[in-house]
Amino acid sequence: MFQAAILRKKKKIEIHNFNFPQKLRCDQVLIKIKYAGICGSQIMEYLGKRGKDFYLPHCFGHEAVGKVFAIGKRVTKVKIGDKVILSWIKGKGLDFGGFTLKNTKKEKINFGPISALSSHVIACENRVFLKPDKMNYLEAVLYGCAVPTGAGIVLNQLKKIRENTKVCLIGVGGVGNAALLALLKKKCQIYIVENNNYKLKFLKKFNLKILKNNFELRKHSNFFDICVETSGSAKMIEKSLDLIHPSGMVVFASHPPKGDYIKINPHHLIQGKKIFGSWGGCCHLDKDIQKIFKFFDYKNTFIKNSKIKKYSLNKISLAIEEVLKGKVNRAIIKF
């Protein structure tokens, strides 16, 4: 038997018990989970800001780490006993989509190709990746979403960063913190836009220039070479274009609520300003997990330089609330 967090409706999470299926689908991998992370996507679902949810009630979550417990008959990527990272980012392997499973009360519950907030996860083969041997389990869970998205932007989309490059980073949540640590290793000129008091206290250790209000932002109009936007605010994505100079670039990995749109001054684009979205930091995790780990000198960098807090599964609503308040960069469910 295993337990999973089930989103019943907006702002209502329940913990359900499930019996293991008698047989896995041919593309599926069963993983006993050590840690699972809560990121902005789950919080958006919880708050009902992704629009109408057609799959309620459903398990959710999309980054985790654990050990392979069983595999479907056509799975070749991993074997029983392998230590693996789970991610929403698709890699090599089979993927025949989501499925339903009855809980112990005989109610049908929806599961996706990966639904990670569960003591045991049944995932499609293409969402499962081998964990590097030297990588700590707690570090590894962040490689399911936060690290490839944040650090991936820096390594895959901003390859020309130099020491004299002026970079503005907006928002220091899980993805923003990963981008920050990658930028610090690039030794460029970093400015942070943040006004959450918990996060400002955390940022003191890095001794960076902080832009806290609109006055300071206006002073830096047309100033930056690059702006990385991770706050999830449509208004801040718009503001990013004001901050870069005419040949500058904005990359945003944030996901504003459904119905929030950005308005762009056409003259910004005529000037030569560029704006790009980022899908998982343009990462291919079958190779980029190792690539990013190597970039950080095979060290467990993120658990040493992030505000991470562990919670039990039955404290998941508290974990979400503390992320929303900015008390932690990443909330981790420990199983």
Residue ranges and their predicted role:
Residues 19-36, 49-93, 132-135:
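Glycine-rich beta-strand-centered segment in the early N-terminal region that forms part
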Residues 90-170:
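NAD(P)H dinucleotide-binding glycine-rich loop of Rossmann-like/cofactor-binding domains
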Residues 235-300, 335:
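Glycine-rich phosphate-binding loop and adjacent beta-alpha segment
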